[in-house]
From Swiss-Prot:
The active site is at residue 223. Residues 73-472 form the GH18 domain. Glycans are attached at residues 147, 228, 456, 472. Residues 1-34 form the signal peptide. Its EC number is 3.2.1.14. Present with 3050 molecules/cell in log phase SD medium. This is Sporulation-specific chitinase 2. GO terms for molecular function: chitin binding; chitinase activity; endochitinase activity; exochitinase activity. It comes from Saccharomyces cerevisiae (strain ATCC 204508 / S288c) (Baker's yeast).
């Protein structure tokens, strides 16, 4: 009995050890597989926590600033309302509408006395008749554009033409967003955030103007809130109120929560010293996209020469740093970040021009410079701005275009006059498109449309960028394509709305 009992205990002990070993192995396997199986879910949860920033979002705002289900990418351009004038003579119908998803119309200004927003150029915005030149360019529109009865009801100005184009361009759907502010009007943001009455009037006026003129959303361009407590917090309050007002308009039109949505975006600084003081995580709850201005890293204000729209560098002045700062520090969803690119170059007159014969290995950055180059007929013809070169006129006559793959920037150098110009070209924007897809960003945009090489497809920045995206560009239609929006507009404004005659014409054409 003693021997049998010992043998039994031995077998029991062996079984126990095997069970313990099996449990241990199971735990190890589960730990190894956990990260692999649940990594994405955990990342989403962490990202959501960062986005909420520990603050509960009001029920009528929740998720309304995060419409990022579209798997396609943004390919957008800013169009300025001074573009139709000399020396640019650039009109909305000159944009390659087949290749863009968003056009940001710049700019509306703030009335500092009332808080309301106003046109910066009423003639360009609402009165200029562009249909004759449009009809000449695009023969398929000649019939309607030359029809006198129809011509009298077409909305005028650049804004009117853009609305017309997004209702007639069958090849590609795109949105037009109203941009408020800009560098020259940013001081007025500081005024309205200090006065609740002015701020409320700004919000009401912005949404009213956006809808009355047929825009698909609002883009805020405050350059830039101060590095203090009051202005960043005031910006947060402004954005929150604006999103609530847009939500209210959506509820009146659609009656309930819907995917149909007026977009709210921010043209954001891409410098650490500006981003650091902004309540990004809290603002992020209310916006759809951050248009990151990842350009103008170097210019006339700099101490040395540099690439002004580079993707990488040894310093923090580059697009890659700005994108990852938004993601890693503030927890912004990468799909809400839109990479900014420049359709222009910045020039420098290098002080030390004692180079060996210039070649692609010649170092032209981090050099002392004396101005940005004297005005020449070439510059005057280009844009009239010293130191600014529209991409379509680059490389400079007499130079050879170069490309720096380390920084992802193009440049050219005029040896005779010691002028160095940095800019984006087809190589750099295609690399940036690959960067966008690799990092799952929201897309890209350009400041501004007049610099694009529309006449030469092989030099087109937009075409090269879209090619890098494998032409996976968003084609969501304007919110004004929805019959409910048109009906609400006509009920609200009757025959007196800016778009009323044309909207009635569209309805009659469908019947």
């Amino acid at each position: 009995m003693v021997g049998h009992s010992a043998q039994h205990r031995s077998k029991s002990s062996l079984v126990s050890h095997l069970l313990i070993l099996l449990i241990f192995i199971t735990i190890i396997i589960e730990m190894c597989l956990y990260n692999k199986i649940f990594k994405n879910q955990r990342s989403d949860d962490i990202r959501d926590n960062f986005n909420n920033g520990g603050h509960r979002v009001p029920s009528n705002v929740q998720n309304h600033g995060t419409h990022i289900r579209d798997e396609a990418f943004i390919s957008g351009v800013y169009y300025s309302n001074w573009s139709p004038y000399k020396p640019r003579f650039h009109f909305p119908h000159d944009i390659n509408l087949k290749q863009v998803s968003h056009i940001y119309y710049a700019f509306f200004k703030i009335n500092s006395r009332t808080g309301g927003i106003e046109n910066t150029d009423s003639w360009s915005d609402l009165e200029m008749n562009l249909y004759k030149s449009l009809a000449i360019k695009n023969s398929e529109l000649i019939k309607e554009s030359s029809n006198n009865s129809v011509q009298n009801i077409l909305p005028l100005g650049c804004i009117g033409e853009l609305f017309y184009l997004k209702n007639t361009c069958s090849d590609k759907k795109f949105k037009v967003i109203m941009s408020i502010g800009g560098w020259s009007d940013s001081e007025n943001f500081k005024i309205i955030i200090k006065d609740d009455k002015l701020l409320q009037n700004f919000v009401d006026s912005s949404v009213e103007t956006m809808f009355r003129l047929g825009f698909d959303g609002i883009d805020l361009d405050w350059e830039f809130p101060g590095n203090n407590e009051s202005e960043p917090r005031g910006y947060l309050k402004l954005v929150r109120m604006l999103r609530l007002k847009l939500n209210s308009l959506e509820s009146q039109i659609f009656g309930k929560r819907t995917e149909d949505h007026f977009q709210l975006s921010i043209a954001a600084p891409a410098f650490k010293d500006k981003l650091f003081y902004l309540p990004i995580t809290e603002i992020d709850q209310y916006v759809d996209y951050w248009n990151m201005m990842t350009y103008d890293y170097y210019g006339s204000w700099s101490e040395t020469t540099g690439y002004h729209s580079n993707l990488f560098s040894e310093t923090e002045l580059n697009g890659n740093f700005a994108m990852h700062y938004m993601i890693d520090r503030f927890g912004v969803n990468s799909r809400k970040l839109v990479l900014g690119m420049a359709a222009y170059g910045r020039s420098f007159h290098i002080k030390d021009n004692k180079f060996e014969p210039f070649n692609q290995n010649t170092v032209l950055i981090n050099k002392i410079f004396k101005g940005v180059g004297k005005p020449t007929k070439e510059i005057d013809k280009a844009d009239g701005k010293e130191g600014i070169w529209p991409y379509k006129n680059l490389p400079k006559i007499g130079t050879i275009e170069q490309y720096d793959p380390k920084y992802v920037s193009a440049y050219c150098f005029d040896e005779k006059n010691s002028i160095f110009i940095s800019y984006d070209n087809t190589k750099s924007v295609k690399t940036k498109a690959e960067y966008v897809t690799h990092n799952n960003l929201g897309g890209g945009f350009w400041w501004e449309s007049c610099g694009e090489a529309y006449a030469n497809e092989s030099r087109s920045l937009i075409n090269a960028f879209n090619e890098g995206l494998h032409f996976n560009v968003s084609s969501k239609p304007s919110i004004f394509q929805d019959v409910r929006v048109k009906k609400y507009y006509l009920n609200k404004y009757g025959d007196g709305g800016f778009l009323s005659p044309y909207l009635k014409h569209l309805d009659s054409r469908k019947q």
